[in-house]
A protein has these predicted regions:
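DPxDG-like acidic metal-binding loop motif
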Residues: 62-93
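Oxyanion-binding and handling regions
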Residues: 1-24, 34-41, 94-225
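N-terminal, well-ordered alpha-helical segments
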Residues: 40, 44-47, 61, 79, ...
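Conserved phosphate-binding/catalytic region of the ribokinase-like
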Residues: 26-28
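Phosphate/pyrophosphate-binding loops at sites that engage ATP/ADP/AMP, CoA/4′-phosphopantetheine
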Residues: 46-62, 133, 152-160
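N-terminal phosphate-binding loop and adjacent alpha-helix
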Residues: 31-51
Length: 225
């Protein structure tokens, strides 16, 4: 399968093409990365990797989207692109946790043992997931959850390597690691289940704090309160 992967959940936004672009038994992996909190040229990145891979848009068979947690704006942008692509071309869609992508990236980079993925959740909290990495694979030990700084620090104190896009802002011993679209695409190639565009949603574990305003009260003279 020829997969276009979009990973926009961190300040290092990336797009990649992975798969058997040249036919069965071949392998292609191309990637383009843009850095900065205000990076906003996704279609240029997409065209860059398609050109590098010598692939036309109509040849893309699947889109893999990093669902976060992370930059809500970036993730929403990637989802919108995938939904539009699905409407224009009947491609397969896959949504993948960016925390899983980071675990796979850590394994690919040679880390072994216990690894904790740490992503800023704001409000003094973090998204935290724990993994075990050995020579052949990685596996989830504790699933993604919201955690206070004390729990993250405790994971590090137990010997976990803390990894994440901005982890050193809070934990100096951590290792900076960004989720990569190329890694996301390789994870997607192992997927056998696909999702409809309307069901793609950012991973956001915190309950909404927005309250619906009550209806206006009408005074005896007929004017609203």
């Amino acid at each position: 399968m020829k997969i276009l992967a979009l990973e926009f959940s961190s300040p290092h936004r990336s797009v990649a093409v992975v798969g058997n672009v040249r036919g069965p038994g071949t392998w292609t992996e191309t990637e383009a990365v843009e850095t900065g909190d205000r990076s906003n040229r996704p279609f240029e990145l997409i065209q860059d990797v398609l050109t590098q891979a010598r692939l036309e848009r109509v040849q893309v068979e699947g889109l893999a989207i990093g669902l976060g947690p992370g930059s809500y704006t970036g993730i929403r942008g990637a989802i919108a692109i995938a939904q539009g692509w699905k409407l224009a071309r009947d491609v397969r869609l896959m949504g993948i946790s960016s925390a899983e992508c980071l675990a796979a990236q850590a394994h690919s980079d040679g880390l072994r043992g216990r690894v904790s993925v740490v992503i800023d959740a704001q409000r003094g909290e973090f998204y935290l997931a724990n993994y075990e990495l050995d020579s052949s694979e990685w596996r989830e030990v504790q699933p993604l959850r919201l955690a206070p700084a004390e729990e993250v620090a405790a994971s590090g104190a137990k010997g976990d390597v803390l990894v994440g896009p901005e982890v050193q802002n809070w934990f100096q011993e951590g290792r900076i690691l960004f989720p990569r679209a190329a890694t996301l695409g390789k994870l997607a190639l192992k997927k056998t289940e696909f999702i409809e565009g309307q069901h793609l949603e950012p991973i956001y574990l915190r309950k909404s704090s927005f309250l619906k305003a009550p209806p206006p009260r009408i005074l005896p003279d007929g004017s609203p309160l």
